[in-house]
């Protein structure tokens, strides 16, 4: 490492070149001091390469000489003095005068100190940044930079769809953005085509491992059925019950994708459900036919009695008409009851486990919990205040540790509510349509 640099000015009364001056320095200092022969010092690395910068001014040559030195301060000063002893370059008089010995380490330290001051000043001026702002900025950047349009249908997708050997198929653009936010770039959306699967999706599903990732509600099941019937899907992932893919956290996404169900198994499960539904419909139809047959028998009996009494009174056919009306009414009631039961089953299927855990928690406390359509808790109030809470805040579902009353059902219907979960129901004169009661065991 160079410790010092000797800087000297040179002036020669004649037209000389740089190598002439360097040769004169070595030649005229040789033999002056035995231990300070410049050639030997250079060979040992004690001094560096001598640099000369010249300019011509008429018949004169003027310039600067630089000699790097690894010697100590005293020895460097001695070399500097030796330079000044040179008084000729070739046949021309010359003058060399040392103007400065630069301490390289000191200069380096000086630069370090100045730079440290600049860094500290800049650092002091910068304000501390909120981590939430950083995360938001990164998130927004990810959204804007990574979302692409793929295929002739211009489907919302991530940049990894083309290069990855696995794709994740979701329903819409918002689902794609949410998965991109958490680093899943091999995602593509149906683009609103929930009934007819786009050709681009079909083609990708044939070429790659395809994962269908759908919402945890009835709509998600419908999308899944269409995908399984029209595209070559390998695995199925579902959001937690009652939740949509676009609202999931990183942990929920990872959990859903780690619990993949083979598409073949999911098809079997869906077929079983459809078979059970068909059997239930068949059973209801058979019961309705039985009721109808019984009423027809009654109708015939009434008709026979009517013929016998025809001479005594008019309108003998009225009982027949009444019997038919009753049969039709009974059949209609049975169908309505069955339809309501099916709807309740569908709603119960998508109630999160956390709600049932909450039901255990509030048992015996006479409290009520109001939920929105995403099963987020809107409010938790005493059971006696539940009606006013529904009127004020509205609710998709209510978990009620108390008696479910007519007033409660009416207010839920008025506010667009759908479910009431509880253990006891009071005498209800009229149950509003669209509001369903789930009795907990």
Curated annotation (Swiss-Prot):
Molecular function GO terms recorded: DNA-directed RNA polymerase activity; metal ion binding; poly(A) binding
Protein name, per record: DNA primase DnaG
UniProt xrefs under Pfam families: Toprim_4
InterPro entries for the chain: DnaG_primase, Primase_DnaG_arc, TOPRIM_DnaG/twinkle, TOPRIM_dom
Binding-site list for Mg(2+) 1: 171, 215
Occurrences of domain Toprim (ranges): 165-241
SMART domains: TOPRIM
One GO term (biological process): DNA replication, synthesis of primer
Assembly mode: Forms a ternary complex with MCM helicase and DNA. Component of the archaeal exosome complex.
EC number(s) stated in the UniProt entry for this protein: 2.7.7.101
Cofactor binding mode and count: Binds two Mg(2+) per subunit.
Catalysed reaction equations from the record: ssDNA + n NTP = ssDNA/pppN(pN)n-1 hybrid + (n-1) diphosphate
Basic and acidic residues composition-biased segments: 299-315
One GO cellular component term noted in the UniProt record for this chain: primosome complex
Stretches the record annotates as Disordered: 299-320
CDD domains the UniProt entry points to: TOPRIM_primases
Family label: Belongs to the archaeal DnaG primase family.
Origin: domain of life: Archaea
Residues bound to Mg(2+) 2: 215, 217
Role: RNA polymerase that catalyzes the synthesis of short RNA molecules used as primers for DNA polymerase during DNA replication. Also part of the exosome, which is a complex involved in RNA degradation. Acts as a poly(A)-binding protein that enhances the interaction between heteromeric, adenine-rich transcripts and the exosome.
NCBIfam families: PRK04031.1-1 (NF003108)
Group of enzyme by EC: transferase
Cofactor(s) required for function per UniProt: Mg(2+)
Disulfide-bond pairs as recorded: none
Key words, A-Z: DNA replication, DNA-directed RNA polymerase, Exosome, Magnesium, Metal-binding, Nucleotidyltransferase, Primosome, Transcription, Transferase
């Amino acid at each position: 490492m160079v410790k010092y640099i000797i800087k000297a000015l040179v002036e020669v009364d004649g037209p000389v070149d740089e190598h002439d001056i360097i040769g004169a320095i070595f030649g005229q200092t040789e033999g002056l001091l035995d231990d300070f022969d410049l050639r030997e010092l250079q060979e040992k690395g004690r001094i560096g390469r001598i640099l000369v910068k010249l300019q011509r001014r008429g018949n004169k040559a003027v310039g600067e000489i630089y000699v790097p030195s690894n010697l100590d301060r005293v020895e460097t000063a001695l070399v500097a003095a030796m330079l000044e002893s040179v008084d000729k370059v070739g046949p021309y008089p010359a003058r060399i005068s040392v103007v400065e010995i630069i301490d390289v380490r000191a200069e380096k330290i000086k630069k370090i100190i100045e730079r440290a001051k600049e860094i500290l000043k800049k650092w002091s001026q910068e304000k501390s940044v909120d981590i939430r702002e950083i995360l938001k900025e990164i998130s927004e950047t990810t959204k804007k930079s990574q979302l692409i349009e793929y295929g002739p249908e211009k489907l919302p997708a991530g940049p990894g769809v083309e290069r990855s050997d696995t794709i994740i198929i979701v329903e819409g653009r918002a689902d794609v953005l949410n998965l991109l936010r958490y680093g899943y770039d091999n995602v593509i959306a149906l683009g609103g085509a929930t009934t007819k699967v786009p050709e681009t999706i079909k083609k990708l599903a044939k070429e790659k491992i395809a994962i269908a990732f759908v919402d945890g509600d009835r709509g998600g099941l419908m999308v899944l059925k269409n995908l399984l019937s029209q595209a070559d899907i390998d695995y199925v992932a579902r959001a937690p019950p009652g939740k949509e893919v676009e609202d999931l956290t990183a942990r929920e996404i990872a959990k859903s994708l780690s619990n993949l169900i083979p598409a073949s198994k999911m098809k079997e499960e869906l077929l079983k459900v459809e078979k059970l539904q068909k059997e239930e419909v068949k059973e209801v139809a058979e019961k309705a036919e039985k009721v109808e047959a019984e009423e027809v028998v009654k109708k015939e009996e009434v008709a026979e009695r009517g013929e016998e009494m025809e001479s005594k009174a008019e309108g003998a056919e009225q009982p027949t008409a009444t019997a038919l009306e009753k049969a039709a009414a009974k059949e209609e009631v049975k169908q309505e009851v069955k339809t309501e039961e099916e709807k309740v089953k569908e709603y119960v299927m998508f109630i999160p486990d956390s709600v049932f855990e909450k039901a255990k928690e509030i048992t015996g406390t006479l409290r009520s919990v109001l939920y929105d359509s995403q099963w987020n808790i809107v409010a938790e109030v005493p059971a006696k205040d539940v009606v006013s809470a529904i009127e004020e805040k509205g609710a998709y579902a209510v978990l009620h540790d108390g008696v479910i009353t007519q007033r409660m059902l009416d207010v839920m219907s008025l506010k667009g509510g759908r479910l009431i979960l509880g253990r006891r129901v009071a005498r209800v004169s009229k149950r509003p349509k669209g509001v369903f009661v789930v009795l907990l065991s």
